[in-house]
Amino acid sequence: METFLFTSESVNEGHPDKLCDQISDAVLDACLAQDPDSKVACETCTKTNMVMVFGEITTKADIDYEKIVRDTCRTIGFVSDDVGLDADNCKVLVNIEQQSPDIAQGVHGHLTKRPEEIGAGDQGHMFGYATDETPELMPLSHVLATKLGARLTEVRKNGTCSWLRPDGKTQVTVEYHNENGAMVPLRVHTVLISTQHDETVTNDEIAADLKEHVIKPVIPEKYLDEKTIFHLNPSGRFVIGGPHGDAGLTGRKIIIDTYGGWGAHGGGAFSGKDPTKVDRSGAYIVRQAAKSIVANGLARRCIVQVSYAIGVPEPLSVFVDSYGTGKIPDKEILKIVKENFDFRPGMIAINLDLKRGGNGRFLKTAAYGHFGRDDPDFTWEVVKPLKWEKA
């Protein structure tokens, strides 16, 4: 049997880029909670002892940006210079302006357009992907890398591994078989974890704890064998981390946010953007379309693309590829998709309830992936029933 290796990586919530994603989405949540029509494009950057939020926001909400930044950093665990950032004493810079009136008139007519008339906030193309290899209908390599990152944070916060610090990265290589276009995972080939730690712990203790408390609970036993390779903190030392170790920026982890290198990506990031930004809303609706195709048995694996022009409500194109796994021809699947999903940005916002912020709704998406999550706030993960004639 022919097999191949495929690798996906993830980072946990203390990684500087992910810290920035979470701050940007915390700002979005705060804006939408008070004013669902907020127009938000919020970027964040960070380096030693400094966080800056900047961008374009038009909102009726009263926002304390500095408090949001400090609260988000503190919740993640950045509570001292030792761990990479001190939430209560770092510099917080804010440079927020209003949305360009040129963009506002073209997209939503300064809030006068009806939902079905709202144009895309920018041009671009987005992809949605689904595969039947996991219950989440997501790629296994991505699911495992993501869950390892989440578990690292869990055992840090609950005290199981008190030597852990917030920053960390994971990577999983899976051996696959291509079954007529569908992906069948056979085993985990390599597990890599690099996690920030304090000065007190030895490399042997790190490796033992990671195997026992992180890898064992996350990776099903059936995928591990005596040949599985483990690289656990292979650099030998990772004490300096967070923004002290590396600069961070919103939108730098778009593959981790989506499908771990599977499918395709149009390049647009998600965090800090309201639903008129099709980078986000367009990607969410095509995930729902792809997932619904697989869940309804139309195909075992599927990718959907949508594209937009700024100010134009209707998509320019919709594309479907079932990688040869479709039960009916792709052109018929495409017809079903177009009949069942409304790709106009104003309607996506209504149908997926994307103008509802607050309670960490979008903040939750900003670490551990936007897709394949079992949470009612992730409305784009709800499978739509699709009617089709079985051949």
Curated annotation (Swiss-Prot):
Q: Which cofactor does it need?
A: Mn(2+); Mg(2+); Co(2+); K(+)
- Where is K(+) annotated to bind? E43
Reaction(s) catalyzed by this protein? L-methionine + ATP + H2O = S-adenosyl-L-methionine + phosphate + diphosphate
* Record's subcellular location: Cytoplasm
One Pfam family name from the record?
Answer: S-AdoMet_synt_M
Q: GO CC annotations?
A: cytoplasm
According to the record, cofactor stoichiometry and binding are noted as: Binds 2 divalent ions per subunit. The metal ions interact primarily with the substrate. Can utilize magnesium, manganese or cobalt (in vitro). Binds 1 potassium ion per subunit. The potassium ion interacts primarily with the substrate.
What are the recorded Gene Ontology BP terms? one-carbon metabolic process; S-adenosylmethionine biosynthetic process
Single GO molecular-function term?
methionine adenosyltransferase activity
Residues annotated for L-methionine binding in this entry? E56, Q99, D246, K277
Q: What is the E.C. number?
A: 2.5.1.6
- Where, by residue number, does ATP bind? H15, D167, G168, K169, S235, G236, R237, F238, D246, R252, K253, A269, K273, K277
Instruction: Check the record and name the InterPro entries matching this protein.
Output: ADOMET_SYNTHASE_CS, S-AdoMet_synt_C, S-AdoMet_synt_central, S-AdoMet_synt_N, S-AdoMet_synthetase, S-AdoMet_synthetase_sfam
* Main localisation: cytoplasm
Pathway(s) where this gene product acts: Amino-acid biosynthesis; S-adenosyl-L-methionine biosynthesis; S-adenosyl-L-methionine from L-methionine: step 1/1
Q: Which UniProt keywords apply?
A: ATP-binding, Cobalt, Cytoplasm, Magnesium, Metal-binding, Nucleotide-binding, One-carbon metabolism, Potassium, Transferase
- What residues does Mg(2+) bind to? E9
- Tell me how this protein assembles: Homotetramer.
- Entry function: Catalyzes the formation of S-adenosylmethionine from methionine and ATP. The reaction comprises two steps that are both catalyzed by the same enzyme: formation of S-adenosylmethionine (AdoMet) and triphosphate, and subsequent hydrolysis of the triphosphate.
Family designation: Belongs to the AdoMet synthase family.
Name assigned to this protein? S-adenosylmethionine synthase 5
The organism is Vitis vinifera (Grape)
